[in-house]
Amino acid sequence: MAIVSSNAASQRPRPDRGPDRVPNRVVDGARQAEDDRDPGRVGAKEDSLRPKRLADYIGQRELKQVLGIAVQAAVGRGEALDHVLLYGPPGLGKTTMAMVLAEELGVTCRITSAPALERPRDIVGLLVTLQPKDLLFIDEIHRLSRVAEELLYPAMEDRRLDLTVGKGSTARTRALDLPPFTLVGATTRAGALSSPLRDRFGLIQRLEFYGLEDLQAIVERAAGLLDLDLSAAACTEIARRCRGTPRIANRLLRRVRDVACVRACAGRIDQALVDEALTLHRVDGRGLDASDRRLMELLLQSHGGGPAGLDTLAAALGEDPATLESVVEPYLLQLGFLQRTPRGRVVTAAGRGHLGWPYPQEQAA
């Protein structure tokens, strides 16, 4: 139960109120299509790369199957979709999936993030303006404050807001009924969610890194939407270097487009041009960037390959430990170039080989 001011409790927030408006984005199917037709609108190109329907969403087959069944069942019963928690590394399509679900359900998707919901009236303002069956997407949901979480408990379970109006002896409890809605939460740290919040999600699904075949299809689709003529080898090269992440694939594709534009490349973009563009941005053949190599080289040069503690490495690199752990390390771990041990981080034999660093026995010799 949360304490809010009597003014906030007695008035239903209006979407057009300036100071009290909660920072969020409303995505509507018809408006989305209009934005895509007008490339002059902010975000038109960015949104145009996002798939709109489950059939267009490439990869994550098991996730699509589970959510597809849930959507069909909810539509068939005329109910709101059960609450969904999506977790996994950044850039794998959690926000896109929320927008796809809203499109499949034919409802409005309200997009916000946990850091934007600092005050109780922020989350209250969002919840009381939801229409029946609307989808509310909260990114970085693990960063919700305790008060915001407590407001969500009855809202998710009983479609009710429990508010305490006033203070001291004049305090009274007021319950506001909410329409049926779907909360879709996204997080890169599922373990950081409190158990009461996590247990209120009916569907908890993990997004996995993408395979090469799916990434090739994603790059081909994005190239078509950006009016780029990519050779098959060029497409494969981008897919190999994007760290199994569609967001990075689209970013690298745009950097290739920049180089092609400057080079006045009027024909098909080939593998050589892709290699030139990505080498310029210090992305090597396995997708490692400058941050990855700095971490591994620090371990090798200053710590003999490890082990070394995360805080020690972060201080030496001038990085935040959380950034190293959540952004840099996952892909190195996936490739088998890095190991996490109780004593710290260690560069593996595969990591040494990739950097051309001699093995310990060679150094001793």
Curated annotation (Swiss-Prot):
Binding of ATP, residues? L49, R50, G91, K94, T95, T96, R200, Y210, R247
> Which GO CC terms are listed, alphabetically?
cytoplasm; Holliday junction resolvase complex
Q: Where is this region: Head domain (RuvB-H)?
A: 285-365
Q: Where is this region: Disordered?
A: 1-48
Which Pfam family is an annotated match for this chain, by its short name?
Answer: RuvB_N
Provide the leader sequence positions: none
Which PANTHER family does this chain map to? HOLLIDAY JUNCTION BRANCH MIGRATION COMPLEX SUBUNIT RUVB (PTHR42848:SF1), PTHR42848
Q: How does it assemble?
A: Homohexamer. Forms an RuvA(8)-RuvB(12)-Holliday junction (HJ) complex. HJ DNA is sandwiched between 2 RuvA tetramers; dsDNA enters through RuvA and exits via RuvB. An RuvB hexamer assembles on each DNA strand where it exits the tetramer. Each RuvB hexamer is contacted by two RuvA subunits (via domain III) on 2 adjacent RuvB subunits; this complex drives branch migration. In the full resolvosome a probable DNA-RuvA(4)-RuvB(12)-RuvC(2) complex forms which resolves the HJ.
Q: Tell me what this protein is called.
A: Holliday junction branch migration complex subunit RuvB
**Which gene specifies this protein's sequence?**
ruvB
